Structures are given as C-alpha cells and as structure tokens.
Amino acid sequence: MMLEPSIDSLQKRIKSKYSLVTLSARRARQLSETNQPLVEKSKSHKFVGMALEEIEAGKLYIEN
C-alpha cells in the first residue's frame, strides 16, 4: 500500500520530519474544528491526510 502524499514529496517542502509532524498535527486539529480545507478536492477524508495534502500543495509552510 502506497501512502499519498509520499514522505519524499513532503520533505521537499518541509525538510525536518519533526516539523512536518508538528505542522500537520496542528493543521489537522484546526481542520477538525473548522472543516475548511485549503485544497479544493482532497483525496483523504481524514484531517491528517488533508493537512498533508495541503503541505504538498504548498498551501502550508513553516516560516523561518
């Protein structure tokens, strides 16, 4: 079974695995409260999956 989006494609956007987990968890919590995804047609129906798709699409990022 292949996960979408892949960890490799996500790490092109967010270099640190730990930052990736933190960002996706925070966004998933926001999505659970508001249910307003930034991507139009999400493949996932779970909030963490939606958050990862937003990161891959470049809608979420970490400011340095």
Curated annotation (Swiss-Prot):
It catalyses: RNA(n) + a ribonucleoside 5'-triphosphate = RNA(n+1) + diphosphate. GO terms for biological process: DNA-templated transcription. The keyword Flavoprotein does not apply. GO terms for cellular component: DNA-directed RNA polymerase complex. It is an enzyme of class 2 (transferase). Keywords: DNA-directed RNA polymerase, Nucleotidyltransferase, Transcription, Transferase. GO terms for molecular function: DNA binding; DNA-directed RNA polymerase activity. Its EC number is 2.7.7.6. The keyword Nucleotide-binding does not apply. Belongs to the RNA polymerase subunit omega family. Promotes RNA polymerase assembly. Latches the N- and C-terminal regions of the beta' subunit thereby facilitating its interaction with the beta and alpha subunits. The RNAP catalytic core consists of 2 alpha, 1 beta, 1 beta' and 1 omega subunit. When a sigma factor is associated with the core the holoenzyme is formed, which can initiate transcription. This is DNA-directed RNA polymerase subunit omega. It comes from Oceanobacillus iheyensis (strain DSM 14371 / CIP 107618 / JCM 11309 / KCTC 3954 / HTE831).
